Amino acid sequence: MSKSETYRIEVEAVAEYVEAQSNPEDDHYVFAYNITIRNTGTVAARLVSRHWVITDGTGHVQEVHGQGVVGEQPLLAPGESFRYTSGSVLETAVGTMHGSYQMEASDGHRFDAPIPAFMLAMPRVLH
């Protein structure tokens, strides 16, 4: 069995604009994102840390590194999923996020699980 089949984590992200917490007049745009992390490999793996690359509409890039997610380092058995919600604040009405989770398999192997890029956008801004 190849390493790509053994150590496989799929990440899905869905973002939404949080109008109630945003203030466009002050360039304060709040977005929530829902993440689903699914272990589609053949060994258990723990999410150890995260790395986000957040780019706003002007091209300004912010990188975020941290341990776990929402205060947890979930252990995912093969076939298991973990879901969480978090947020990001931008100074522009649009932006993108992508990154990776650093995982540690039950056999000690460490690997990165890529987080595909997703859009942060205030409704009716993009055509």
UniProtKB/Swiss-Prot annotation:
Residue ranges of domain ApaG in the record: 3-127
GO biological processes: error-free translesion synthesis
Organism annotation: Azoarcus sp. (strain BH72)
Domain of life: Bacteria
Residue ranges of coiled coil: none
Gene that encodes it: apaG
Transmembrane segments: none
Pfam families: DUF525
Protein name (Swiss-Prot/TrEMBL): Protein ApaG
HAMAP family in alphabetical order: ApaG
